[in-house]
Amino acid sequence: MIRTVGRLVYTPPVVPQDVAHSGPFGKLKVALVADYFTSVCLSAECRIRSLPTDNYRDVIGKWRPDLVFVESAFHGVQGEWRYKLARQPKYIRMSRPRTIRRLAQLVRDKGIPAVFWNKDDSAFFDAFIDVARLFPYVFTTDNTCLPRYAAQLPSGSRADVLAMPY
């Protein structure tokens, strides 16, 4: 019910897609699974494409990003990733988070560097640890979470602190 009403009264803002810029990162192509604010911030520096849940394979295959950047998004641009990343209580969960797993496998198979950034640590460490485990590089905003990531990430994955000013 809440989702249905929400779609009727709220129109998500549009994020500029694939706009080249001057500067050191102006040609860097970044495919994103991120909320609106992060997407807009990154779109000012590099070429971005928001990955849709139903068409990410085509975007990856045709656009050929230099990097896939996934953040601890609760909705994603246009609400595409709502309830598809964070661990949800059973009474809310509509389905298992298969799409993000398939995306992570696809970019791994294609050799595209991929990172996960938990901008919501430490409060939402547990909500996003399953997603973090899918990526070879994990960044957190909270350095006190580094030992937790070291203990829970698969061998070969690396966790570090990333402060990304807006």
Residue ranges of predicted features:
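Membrane-proximal basic amphipathic "stem/tether" segments
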Residues: M1-G23
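Catalytic core of nucleotide-activated saccharide and alditol-phosphate transferases
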Residues: T4-P12, R108-Y166
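Internal alpha/beta domain cores that form substrate/cofactor-binding pockets in large enzymes
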Residues: P16-R64, V68, S72-I112, F135-P136
